[in-house]
Amino acid sequence: FHIKPLPPVIVSLDVSIYDSSSYEDGITVMDRLGEGIIYAINIHGDPVWFVNSNIDWSNGGTYLIQFSHFLPDGGFIGIADGRSGNLSGRAFEMGIHNNLIWEGPGDVDNNGVHHDVFPMPNGNILALTIKDTLVPIPDEIDIPEEYSYIDSIPWHGDRIVEWDRDGNEVWSWSVFDHFDMQDFVSESYESMFTPPNNPTDFFYDWTHSNAVWYDIEDSVVYLSVRHLSRITKIDYPSGNILWNMGKSMPSGDVTVGNHLGLSGQHSVKVLDNRNIM
């Protein structure tokens, strides 16, 4: 057998704290955002496995892969980031030997799949995508005189999509259908009009969700909405919101956990004890 040369970023890893009484057994899987390398290390920081982005995609494109979840058969799913080649991000499944097993649709709107994908029990894949909607500038926003000719700005909002393994969309959910648009962060909105920003490049990154999780016991989807500092619990498949947890907003729709101090959280996960992390 032979061993592939290790990427330099893996070779340079060091363990700074090692408490054998507290460490969880097993290996730790990580990826390098923007570098297209997924790797695993043991308790000593030694690399035991890695895969890279040298993959033959059906469209001949170039993508940087990111890890999301392991599957029961030992493979894993993740996101293929195509922005460096002006391609939409897509979901994928790989085996541990760098073999591509499945490619999600590659023609998704805007930047395509972003941040997270999740394996459904039936084999389908949940993914985060983006939808654009042109929205009038809110009355409470004061914009500089030089931009007074602008009356509307595109809002980026998140859309959860479920695909079967043939790439068919079988379920979807959009923040534009379920969130109150008076819930937004005015400071980040106003920052778009700060020189040297170019008005032709304006869009408001309204929700910027970064994680999605399906819970089979309750048949619900959890969505982590970073820019609203909110976790949303969604009934599946009806799409009705059961609750919003996090920072209070003008709509009054956030009724759980206002005291928790959520601020730009980056994940949501249901633990084995049914708590939410």
Task: Cite the ranges covered by each PLM segment.
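Histidine-/acidic-rich catalytic cores in large beta-rich domains
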Residues: 1-277
